[in-house]
């Protein structure tokens, strides 16, 4: 009587498991890189939103002939202005400065700024980045000296720690 064997031998199963382990070990760094790339893309998008909000706020204030330090309302959010541009405010006042004007979510942290005075610079970071200070960009509010206005600017993104 002849026996018919079906299925895999133990050695075949071990070989398959080892091959799957090697494939997983080589694929893992690629997946980690995807997360980093996604955070860098999110940061670049936020930088674009801040730059657009800065320009929209400037155009809105210019078109209404308001004094350069008079606040405006964009999409129902009151925006504090300095020199015709949104102020850089600390996180405690997000909905009054560039953070609110750009519509940034709680996925971002904001550090610095001048809440009571004119001008100021703030750093916007991706909150869940491994090293948030290395996954950031800056916003420098306009400054006014007499009748001279130095326009606001958005710094280049730093993506090394994303």
Model-flagged regions — what are they?
Residues 1-35:
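N-terminal single-pass transmembrane signal-anchor helix
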Residues 24, 43, 132-133:
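A broadly tuned, weak detector of single residues within folded domains
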Residues 1, 7, 49, 57-58, ...:
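Alpha-helix boundary/capping detector
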Residues 59-162:
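Periplasmic/extracellular, small/polar-rich flexible segments of pilin-like filament-forming proteins
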Residues 6, 37, 48, 77-79, ...:
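Short capping/connector residues at structural and topological boundaries
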Residues 38-65:
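Membrane-proximal N-terminal amphipathic helix
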């Amino acid at each position: 009587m002849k026996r018919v064997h079906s299925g895999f031998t133990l050695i075949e199963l071990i070989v398959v498991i080892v091959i799957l382990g090697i494939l997983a070990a080589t694929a893992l760094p690629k997946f980690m890189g995807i997360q980093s790339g996604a955070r860098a893309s999110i940061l670049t998008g936020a930088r674009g939103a801040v730059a657009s909000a800065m320009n929209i706020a400037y155009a809105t204030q210019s078109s209404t002939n308001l004094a350069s330090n008079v606040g405006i309302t964009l999409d129902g959010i009151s925006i504090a202005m300095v020199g015709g541009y949104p102020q850089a405010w600390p996180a405690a006042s997000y909905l009054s400065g560039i953070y609110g004007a750009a519509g940034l979510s709680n996925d971002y942290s904001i550090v610095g700024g001048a809440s009571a005075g004119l001008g100021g610079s703030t750093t916007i970071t991706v909150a869940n980045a491994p090293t948030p200070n290395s996954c950031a960009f800056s916003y420098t509010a306009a400054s006014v000296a007499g009748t001279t206005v130095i326009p606001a600017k958005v710094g280049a993104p730093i993506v090394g720690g994303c």
